[in-house]
């Protein structure tokens, strides 16, 4: 394949950084453009110390700035779009999430058409498929089953509509007369080193005598390691650039999981952290149906107060459903079309993540020592 270039949005994020680490190992890649609204100084330094001859261009800009996006896409061969706001708690205003996740994706697609970028890979989410009810049971689901989230909550709704826009754009004519090829990847819940969600869980537990706060004990999920999700993006980029593979990939979506055992979210957190003395909360939990209707009441209160006060419920029906459902998916289609096999085994993923949790524990101890002096 001739020399090529790649733009990665959300490159400063949890998944984006891992994609960059794998991209620098790709043959014939001449330039990587890393785009985010703001990069932490340590992330910038990491990009400049990748030890590669590939040109790395750091771009800070707003995904809602259409002119900026068009300039960022000039001369690019592949766009990997991971930039998104992930929030299932209701903390971030709805319009902000819709602007970034949906409008931002639409802006980027238009920039690709105007700049004649031939390949677009969208980091979607399993949330676009549901679960719609905690009563539903989906084990090893697959792409041939028609599953679509019916939630109006901003995160699943915005990701669903953004994915629809991406797949609908497949086959669009580019400004130079070429054709845009798109695909979407739907990873399961992602874990691994530097996961903000996992970090928050551990930090809360450190302040709670190493007791992990529960909430997902009734779930059955198949979480996926961040390194394997990043690998799937690399394979999708290769596939869309390969004339023999591309016809089977363009316009398609793929569930991305790995060989992490099916388990509850609580069990996953415990398995990854038990080496450092963490334990599960043994308290009694309300039955899921009661939690669900309590969430409905809290959402009603929030709605009634909205004209005069922004009340954010501690949990909502969507969150209860996510953490109480049996919802797992197979990666066989990605295996068939992309040649995807997990790059990192469950044992290795568990070890790497556990070691990282150990660094969080050490940082916490150092903070306590400093305060006690």
From Swiss-Prot:
Q: What is its main location?
A: endoplasmic reticulum
Q: Spell out the reaction equation it catalyses.
A: a 3beta-hydroxy-Delta(5)-steroid + NAD(+) = a 3-oxo-Delta(5)-steroid + NADH + H(+); a 3-oxo-Delta(5)-steroid = a 3-oxo-Delta(4)-steroid
Which UniProt keywords are listed? Endoplasmic reticulum, Isomerase, Membrane, Mitochondrion, Multifunctional enzyme, NAD, Oxidoreductase, Steroidogenesis, Transmembrane, Transmembrane helix
Give GO cellular component annotations, separated by semicolons.
Answer: endoplasmic reticulum membrane; mitochondrial inner membrane
Positions that bind NAD(+)? 159
Q: Does the keyword Transmembrane helix apply?
A: yes
Active site: which residues?
155
Alphabetically, the GO molecular function entries are: 3-beta-hydroxy-Delta5-steroid dehydrogenase (NAD+) activity; steroid Delta-isomerase activity
Q: Which residues cross the membrane?
A: 288-308
Q: Which residue pairs form cystines in this protein? A: none
Q: What are the subcellular locations of this protein?
A: Endoplasmic reticulum membrane; Mitochondrion membrane
Mitochondrion as a keyword? yes
Provide the membrane topology annotation: Single-pass membrane protein
Q: In which pathway does it act?
A: Lipid metabolism; steroid biosynthesis
The protein's role, per its UniProt record: 3-beta-HSD is a bifunctional enzyme, that catalyzes the oxidative conversion of Delta(5)-ene-3-beta-hydroxy steroid, and the oxidative conversion of ketosteroids. The 3-beta-HSD enzymatic system plays a crucial role in the biosynthesis of all classes of hormonal steroids.
Protein family membership: Belongs to the 3-beta-HSD family.
Name assigned to this protein: 3 beta-hydroxysteroid dehydrogenase/Delta 5-->4-isomerase type 3
- Which organism does this record belong to? Mus musculus (Mouse)
Per UniProt, what is the name of the gene that codes for the protein in this document?
Hsd3b3
């Amino acid at each position: 394949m001739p020399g090529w270039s790649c733009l990665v949005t959300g490159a400063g994020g949890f998944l984006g950084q891992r994609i960059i680490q794998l991209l620098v190992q790709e043959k014939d890649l001449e330039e990587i453009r890393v785009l985010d609204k703001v990069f932490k100084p340590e992330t910038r330094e990491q990009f400049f110390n990748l030890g590669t001859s590939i040109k790395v261009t750091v771009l800070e800009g707003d995904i809602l700035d259409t002119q900026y996006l068009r300039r960022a896409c000039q001369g690019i061969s592949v766009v990997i779009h991971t930039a998104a706001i992930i929030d299932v708690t209701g903390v971030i205003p709805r319009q902000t999430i819709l602007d970034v996740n949906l409008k931002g994706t639409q802006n980027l697609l238009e920039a690709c058409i105007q700049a004649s970028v031939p390949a677009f890979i969208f980091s979607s989410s399993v949330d676009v498929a549901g679960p719609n009810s905690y009563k539903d049971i989906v084990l090893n689901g697959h792409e041939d089953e028609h599953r679509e989230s019916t939630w109006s909550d901003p995160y699943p709704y915005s990701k669903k509509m953004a994915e629809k826009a991406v797949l609908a754009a497949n086959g669009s004519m580019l400004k130079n007369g070429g054709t845009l090829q798109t695909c979407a990847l739907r990873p399961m819940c992602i874990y691994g080193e530097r996961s903000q969600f996992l970090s928050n869980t551990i930090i809360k537990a450190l302040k709670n005598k190493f007791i992990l706060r529960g909430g997902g004990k009734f779930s059955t999920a198949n979480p996926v390691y961040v390194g394997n999700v990043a690998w799937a993006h690399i394979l999708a980029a290769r596939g869309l650039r390969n004339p023999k593979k591309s016809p089977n990939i363009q316009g398609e979506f793929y569930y991305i999981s790995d060989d992490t055992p099916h388990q509850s979210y609580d069990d996953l957190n415990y398995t990854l952290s038990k080496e450092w003395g963490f334990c599960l909360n043994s308290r009694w939990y309300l039955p899921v149906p009661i939690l669900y209707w309590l969430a409905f009441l809290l959402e009603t209160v929030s709605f009634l107060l909205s004209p005069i006060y922004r009340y954010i419920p501690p949990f909502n029906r969507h969150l209860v459903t996510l953490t109480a459902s049996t919802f797992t998916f197979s990666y066989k289609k990605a295996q068939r079309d992309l040649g995807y096999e997990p790059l990192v085994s469950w044992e290795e993923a568990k070890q790497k993540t556990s070691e990282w949790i150990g660094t969080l524990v050490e940082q916490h101890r150092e903070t306590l020592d400093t305060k006690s002096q």
